[in-house]
C-alpha cells in the first residue's frame, strides 16, 4: 500500500485542483484591457482564473469538469482494480490515466495565468511525471503478446494527421503574415499546440513504428494514446458546453475542425480500446 501513496496523493490533488477551477464558474465579473498587441482582451475576473481571458477560462473550467467527474473516477476504479489484482491490463489502464493526468498538469503549469494554487500545479506535475516514468519503465520491460491489425495502423496514422489538421490552420497564417495567433489575447503562446503537435502527434507514428517491430513499448504508447483520445473527446464536450454557457461565439469552421474531429477520434478510440483491452505477456 505504501507504494501507492504517490497515486493516492495524485488523486487528491486532481480533486482539489479541478474543484478550485470549477468553483471559479462566474460570468459576472469580467473586465477588459488592451494587451501587448494592441487588442482589447476581456478577462474572466472570477476565482483562480480571474486573470485568464474570458474565452480561455471557460475552456479551463470545462477541462476541470471532465477531470473531476470522468478522469478521477476512472483513476480510482483503475487503482482499486490494480490493488486487487495487478496484471498487465490493469497496469496499462493505470499508466494511461496517469499520462492523461500529466497532460492536464502540464497544461495548468504553462497554460494558465499564475494564480494562488500554482504550487499545487507543480506538485501534481512532479508526482505524475516521476510516477509515470517508473510505471512505463516497468511495463516496457514486459514482453507482451499482441497482434497489430491494419485498423490499428490506420487509426494511428489518422490520429497523428488529424492533430495537424486541427491546429496547423491556426499557425500557418501567423507564419506567413508575421502576426500573433488570432486568440493569443493575454498569453504569449499556446501550450496545446506544443503538446499536441510536438508530443502527441509524433507519438502516434512512434507507437506505430514500435508495434510493427513487436516492441512492448509501442503497445504501452498505443494504450496511452487510446485512453488520451477518449478523454479528450469527452473533454471537448464539457469545454464546449461551458463556452456556450459563457456566451462565447465559436466560429462554425473552428467547431467542426476541432470539436467534431476529436469526438470522432474518441469514438474510434473507444472501439479500438474495447477490442484491444486484453493483452497477454508472452512466455
Language-model segment annotations:
Residues 6-20, 103, 121-137, 147-173, ...:
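Alpha-helical transmembrane segments of multi-pass integral membrane proteins
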Residues 23-42:
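Interfacial/capping segments of alpha-helical transmembrane domains
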Residues 37-54, 162-192:
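Membrane-helix boundary elements
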Residues 57-65, 180-203:
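A loop-to-helix transmembrane entry motif
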Residues 75-80, 132-138, 167-168, 198-214, ...:
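Alpha-helical transmembrane segments in multipass membrane proteins, preferentially the mid-helix core
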Residues 78-134:
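Membrane-interface helix-loop-helix junctions at boundaries between adjacent transmembrane segments
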Residues 116-163, 245-283:
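Alpha-helical transmembrane segments and their immediate juxtamembrane flanks
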Residues 211-224, 231-257:
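Extracellular/periplasmic helix-loop-helix junctions in multi-pass membrane proteins
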Amino acid at each position: 500500500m505504501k507504494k501507492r501513496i504517490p497515486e493516492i496523493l495524485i488523486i487528491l490533488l486532481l480533486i482539489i485542483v479541478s474543484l478550485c477551477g470549477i468553483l471559479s464558474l462566474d460570468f459576472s465579473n469580467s473586465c477588459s484591457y488592451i494587451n501587448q498587441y494592441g487588442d482589447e482582451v476581456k478577462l474572466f475576473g472570477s476565482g483562480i482564473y480571474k486573470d485568464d481571458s474570458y474565452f480561455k477560462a471557460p475552456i479551463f473550467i470545462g477541462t476541470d469538469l471532465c477531470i473531476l467527474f470522468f478522469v478521477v473516477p476512472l483513476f480510482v476504479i483503475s487503482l482499486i482494480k490494480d490493488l486487487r489484482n495487478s496484471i498487465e491490463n490493469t497496469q496499462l489502464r493505470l499508466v494511461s490515466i496517469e499520462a492523461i493526468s500529466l497532460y492536464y498538469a502540464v497544461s495548468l503549469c504553462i497554460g494558465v495565468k499564475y494564480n494562488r494554487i500554482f504550487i499545487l500545479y507543480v506538485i501534481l506535475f512532479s508526482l505524475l511525471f516521476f510516477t509515470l516514468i517508473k510505471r512505463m519503465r516497468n511495463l516496457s520491460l514486459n514482453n507482451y503478446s499482441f497482434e497489430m491489425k491494419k485498423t490499428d495502423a490506420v487509426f494511428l496514422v489518422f490520429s497523428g494527421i488529424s492533430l495537424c489538421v486541427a491546429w496547423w490552420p491556426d499557425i500557418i497564417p501567423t507564419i506567413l503574415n508575421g502576426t500573433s495567433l488570432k486568440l493569443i489575447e493575454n498569453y504569449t503562446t499556446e501550450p496545446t499546440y506544443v503538446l499536441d503537435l510536438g508530443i502527441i502527434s509524433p507519438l502516434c507514428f512512434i507507437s506505430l513504428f514500435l508495434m510493427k517491430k513487436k516492441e512492448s513499448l509501442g503497445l504501452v504508447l498505443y494504450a496511452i494514446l487510446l485512453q488520451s483520445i477518449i478523454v479528450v473527446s469527452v473533454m471537448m464536450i464539457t469545454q464546449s458546453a461551458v463556452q456556450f454557457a459563457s456566451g462565447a461565439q465559436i466560429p462554425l469552421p473552428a467547431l467542426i475542425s476541432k470539436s467534431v474531429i476529436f469526438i470522432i477520434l474518441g469514438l474510434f478510440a473507444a472501439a479500438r480500446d474495447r477490442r484491444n483491452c486484453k493483452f497477454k505477456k508472452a512466455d
